[in-house]
Amino acid sequence: MTTPVPVPNGGPAPAAVPAAAEPGSVGIVTPQLIRFDTPLPLASGQSLQSYELAVETYGTLNAGRTNAVLVCHALNASHHVAGLAADDPNDVGWWDNMVGPGKPLDTNRFFVIGVNNLGSCFGSTGPASINPATGHPWGAAFPVLTVEDWVHAQARLADHFGIERFAAVMGGSLGGMQALSWAITCPERVAHCIVIASTPRLSAQNIGFNEVARRAIITDPDFHGGDYYAHNTVPRRGLSVARMIGHITYLSDDDMAEKFGRTQREPAEGGAYRYGYDVEFEVESYLRYQGEKFSRYFDANTYLLITRALDYFDPARGTGGDLARALKPAQADFLLVSFSTDWRFPPERSREIVRALLKNGSPVTYAEIDAPHGHDAFLLDDARYHAVVRGYYERIARELGLDEPAAGAAPAAAEPACAEGCAA
């Protein structure tokens, strides 16, 4: 059984989102917390007996329930995809420039769902939630999750809304991995799969970045083995360093050079160095600021959990490394977008997915955008990038006969249509 209740929004906007809502915003939005009481089996062999998902929706679900789009979030984002949070008008959705009336993903035509993943810290059940077996926060005892676990939880959310098949599942970065997993795991439930700035698996270098970030957190004296809640403390130093490491990988070398170069923060007289170990350069000040800000709102155990889910994602692992064979179950049409200066998930990784899809005869559209902003480009305004996404959704709208805005709300189903997996 599922039960929706309103909850305060807990998802602050990441650094790359705009400071104010874009024209054509969906306006003020209030999230819901939807409870699931059917146990969710996990890839680890464990299960969650019950759990809650924080959700926001935009637009209107049409009578046939055919115009739904699921937006999957990246590492530090949340269900707050678009609009202004009801409890904080300064909290703008992390993809507000993409989702809304008249925007590339047009909420005048599509019913858009944003969901906070299990294990996160913005409302859905996660390490900071109360473990019903103990009456205390889960902490380190919260199960390790995979991208596939998230997809199974999201499929139950689709059941809650009575959605048998999504018009599209869309995501950038880790969100793109979820979209790809949807196409493999629940092929009959995805008409279009939109994968942006993503990869079919993490490289050794990327796993290395994640491990260094995790070690920074775990070795913080305030971590207390993951049970820092009981000690009324937070491993802020480790979490701050983890964010600094991650933030470097989200920006391109050229972008950092243009933003900061070798500009000194507060040089000594005549521009001399100060010959110390405090902040000397502007880039150091920026990274410290980003790290400290992040450590004030993100949960350290969630950071460990999500980076490990990133590490584990590898759909071709079960097919001897043959990505085409791993993608063979997919029935969706695909759009892939990459960015020229993204060195975290470079264009070659998207092209690898494209080649595998073409080998299978899957319909695929691919765009490589020449943009200077690195991995974070998928969050930013870029006319060429947005034109590609807009054009693709125009095609979906034509296929569904959505030339006019959706009319007549279809109420969400009171009970899930299925209890397990992806069967509608």
Swiss-Prot record:
Q: One GO CC term of this entry?
A: cytoplasm
| BP-aspect Gene Ontology terms | homoserine metabolic process; methionine biosynthetic process
What positions are marked as the site Important for acyl-CoA specificity? R344
Pathways involved: Amino-acid biosynthesis; L-methionine biosynthesis via de novo pathway; O-succinyl-L-homoserine from L-homoserine: step 1/1
Active site per database record: S173 (nucleophile), D342, H375
* Catalytic activities: L-homoserine + succinyl-CoA = O-succinyl-L-homoserine + CoA
User: Any S-S bridges, and between which cysteines?
Assistant: none
* Subunit organization: Homodimer.
Q: Into which family does the record put it?
A: Belongs to the AB hydrolase superfamily. MetX family.
- This chain's protein is named Homoserine O-succinyltransferase
Organism name = Bordetella petrii (strain ATCC BAA-461 / DSM 12804 / CCUG 43448)
